Amino acid sequence: VVSQYHELVVQARLSEQELEFR
């Protein structure tokens, strides 16, 4: 369960970084 939550957080951060990078 914790791993899933952590994975979602990581994906969210990556998506935000991609948007900012663009």
From Swiss-Prot:
Q: Where in the cell is it found?
A: Mitochondrion inner membrane; Mitochondrion
Its GO CC terms?
mitochondrial inner membrane
The residues forming the signal peptide are none
> What keywords would UniProt list here?
Membrane, Mitochondrion, Mitochondrion inner membrane
Subunit info? Component of the mitochondrial contact site and cristae organizing system (MICOS) complex, composed of at least MICOS10/MIC10, CHCHD3/MIC19, CHCHD6/MIC25, APOOL/MIC27, IMMT/MIC60, APOO/MIC23/MIC26 and MICOS13/MIC13. This complex was also known under the names MINOS or MitOS complex. The MICOS complex associates with mitochondrial outer membrane proteins SAMM50, MTX1 and MTX2 (together described as components of the mitochondrial outer membrane sorting assembly machinery (SAM) complex) and DNAJC11, mitochondrial inner membrane protein TMEM11 and with HSPA9.
Role: Component of the MICOS complex, a large protein complex of the mitochondrial inner membrane that plays crucial roles in the maintenance of crista junctions, inner membrane architecture, and formation of contact sites to the outer membrane. Plays an important role in the maintenance of the MICOS complex stability and the mitochondrial cristae morphology.
Q: Which family does it belong to?
A: Belongs to the MICOS complex subunit Mic60 family.
Q: What is this protein called?
A: MICOS complex subunit MIC60
Q: Which organism is it from?
A: Mesocricetus auratus
| Source species taxonomy | Eukaryota, Metazoa, Chordata, Craniata, Vertebrata
Q: Which gene encodes it?
A: IMMT
